[in-house]
Amino acid sequence: MKRPMHVIRPATSEDAPEILAFIRELALYEREPDAVRASLSDILRDGWGPQKRFHCLLAESDGAPAGFALYFHNYSTWRGHAGIHVEDLYVRPAYRRRGIGKALLAAVAAIAIDEGCPRLQWDVLEWNTPAITFYEAIGAKRLMEWRTMRISDSALSLLASASSSGSSVDSPGAL
């Protein structure tokens, strides 16, 4: 029996509809099917516009879209280096347990090394034990003492309004 051929390649703007489909499938898997607000124009603007905000790799199995990894650069003040944050890693159910997820992460890891980034990081839902098991098997460590914090939408606007009500901000990075 012929083993399927997997190809990992950089996504192009022509892949934007497939990327959006992957994002929606991942949201469904993560029990948040109504949380996706991203549109095709958002993906095109932020992936291929003048201010590129993310990079994306696609996995194909025998020419069919099988999964993706979407990532962006961050910075560690403690390490004094840029790093890479993997925002989304997703492999369609029909293609799981074939090495595609590992191949996608390995490709992002190779990019990190090539770009002088000494680490990758990502978030995983506590209940997603298959993913946690996979990540630990490839050498990832859980950061038990860290918690992700997020502020968005109206709470973000409320916080931003505090900068114009009596406090002075000299630059976007000032605290």
Where in the sequence are the language-model features?
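Conserved active-site alpha-helix within GNAT-family acetyltransferase domains
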Residues: 102, 106, 126-145, 158
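A short, internal acetyl-CoA/4′-phosphopantetheine-binding micro-motif in the GNAT/acyltransferase core
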Residues: 89-96
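Conserved beta-strand-loop-alpha-helix junction that forms the acyl-donor binding cleft
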Residues: 122-131, 150-154
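Conserved beta-strand in the GNAT
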Residues: 58, 64-73
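A short beta-loop-alpha structural element at the N-terminal edge
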Residues: 7-19
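Conserved GNAT acetyl-CoA-binding A-motif
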Residues: 113-123
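A short helix-loop-beta-strand connector motif used in the catalytic cores of GNAT acetyltransferases and
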Residues: 45-58, 85
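Conserved GNAT-fold acetyl-CoA-binding loop/helix
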Residues: 20-45
